[in-house]
Amino acid sequence: MKLFAINGSPRKKWNTAVLLEKALEGAASAGAETEIVHLYDLDYRGCTSCFACKMVGGKSEGRCAMRDGLTPVLKKIEEEAGALIMGTPIYFWSMTGEMRSFLERLMFAPVVYSVPARSLFPRRIKTAMLYTMNAPEDMCRERGY
């Protein structure tokens, strides 16, 4: 199994990245192949709502049609990932913009507008989301984090 870690933090050596690296170490010790992607190293944008991914029978059906620094990452996840762990610090009560843009491109393209909803992603993969924030534990509890 291949586990991809997606670091949505601008910092490669701080809390979020350290926790992702530890998760990868644990997975590797159990025999998994691992890879970490630092989103801030990539030149990409969020979804532009071009809807090329929704064109039934089109060359991009189910896949993001945008071509930029995120394209090879999305392709590797689609073709190789058995699991995906995403990590982001909380900035201004939310995930980073880079993580949001990554999720838009990863999740919107394969979704089919049907009842019931379905996905064109080739298989189910295990996922986890890891959040870090610089706030005391009682404040996090108080605000429902």
For each of these PLM feature ranges, what is it?
Residues 1-111, 115:
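N-terminal beta1-alpha1-beta2 submodule of the flavodoxin-like/Rossmannoid cofactor-binding fold
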Residues 98, 111-145:
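Short, glycine-/small-residue-rich phosphate/pyrophosphate-handling segment
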